[in-house]
Amino acid sequence: MEFWGLEVKPGSTVKCEPGHGFILHVSQAALGESKKSDSALMYVKVDDKKLAIGTLSIDKYPQIQFDLVFNKEFELSHTSKTTSVFFSGYKVEQPIEGDEMDLDSEDEEEELNIPVIKENGKADGKEEQKNQEKAVAATASKSSLGLEKKSKDDSDDSDEDESDDSDEDDSDDSDEGEGLSPDEGDDDSSDEDDTSDDDEEETPTPKKPEAGKKRGAENALKTPLSDKKAKVATPPAQKTGGKKGATHVATPHPAKGKTPANNDKLTEKSPKSGGSVPCKSCSKTFNSEMALQAHSKAKHGAK
């Protein structure tokens, strides 16, 4: 900052120049010594424009304070014919916007670009670049390992969920297979009733042993329509004539269209004689053990 001041004599005009790179602040104006009461109206002219900035009076306002800022040439004048007017202020350097921006950018570049200096005092830019590349590669490898591990964990979880779902489906299917629908039960009971009725009608006139074989084949062919009913085994036959009947008959899948493998064995073990077999629960008699079993299961719920 630099002090500034000048005198404007009566009837004269003074040009003022702030100077290159400076700003001029006019902060005060005062009247000089005078023996008569006098007043002065002050003017400033900038770019062909003349403006009044104040009035000085020895009796009332011998001085005035203000703050006028000029960055280019201007002119000062007043109307007093007997007394001079003194102006005072100060000058400061005007900052350049481009220089400030350049200084800031240079400081930032110096902070960012700090080279590695060896013992011999020379900067080693290649070594710094290699270190940066190594750091970037290490970070990338860690991130890729983390992603692979996460994807592996997700796949394991999905496999476990699928296995659990399949186990639940299998258990549901097995539970459904164990129970029989009412329609299937009705079909079986109706078939057994028909068989028992046929046996009752044929009881008075027993025929050749071949009739028992045919009935055994018919009963063997009446297998359940669902593959789930194949799990139910036929009950063991009662002892007739000191011999045991077939203990278990497994029925094949109906889709294959084959008759049971042990069909011949069942027919062979059926009674060959035309004698009657009485029911222990009621007074009815049957001409074969198979007919008695079908009757007992249908009428008396034998297991």
Curated annotation (Swiss-Prot):
A zinc finger (C2H2-type) spans 277-300. It comes from the Eukaryota. The keyword Chloroplast does not apply. GO terms for molecular function: hydrolase activity; zinc ion binding. Residues 100-112, 154-203 have a biased composition (Acidic residues). GO terms for biological process: chromatin organization. It is found in: Nucleus, Nucleolus. One of its GO terms (cellular component) is nucleolus. Its main location: nucleus. Keywords: Chromatin regulator, Hydrolase, Metal-binding, Nucleus, Phosphoprotein, Repressor, Transcription, Transcription regulation, Zinc, Zinc-finger. Residues 100-282 are annotated as: Disordered. InterPro entries: NPL, Znf_C2H2_type. Residues 119-133, 204-217 have a biased composition (Basic and acidic residues). Pfam families: NPL. Multimer. Possibly forms a homotrimer with HDT1 and/or HDT3. Belongs to the histone deacetylase HD2 family. Mediates the deacetylation of lysine residues on the N-terminal part of the core histones (H2A, H2B, H3 and H4). Histone deacetylation gives a tag for epigenetic repression and plays an important role in transcriptional regulation, cell cycle progression and developmental events. This is Histone deacetylase HDT2. It comes from Zea mays. The lineage of its organism: Eukaryota, Viridiplantae, Streptophyta, Embryophyta, Tracheophyta.
